[in-house]
Amino acid sequence: MFQLEQLSIAIIGLGYVGLPLAVEFGKQKPTLGFDINQQRIAELLAGHDHTLETSAEELKQALNLRYTHDFTALKQSNFFIVTVPTPIDDFKQPDLTPLIKSSETIGQVLKKGDIVVYELSLIHI
């Protein structure tokens, strides 16, 4: 089990759930925000969030938050929080592709003892 000071946090998916979570963690602890969308990473590095989930001021306050689209940077982390979308398909079933792909990505860098937390929002219609 990790001591709190040993945690190296990575947030996977910087959407409406992941970015605010990464910002709050990044105000307190070293945190890596990962997203496969290079444009998303570029805008966050420029201090802008087009989704308006966080303000420019909040982004500035997260002094311990780094952003990347390079999955190899995840090797430094030992606590992963996955916040990828689970959209509904034409048959009103959740599309788990983003969840599966992010799990495969983490699996490439996962070490014994690492922790993975999944935060999923599923809408049943």
Language model segments and positions:
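Glycine-rich Rossmann-fold phosphate-binding loop(s) that bind the pyrophosphate
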Residues: L14
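A short helix->loop->beta-strand "cap" motif at the edges of active sites that frequently abuts
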Residues: K111-D114
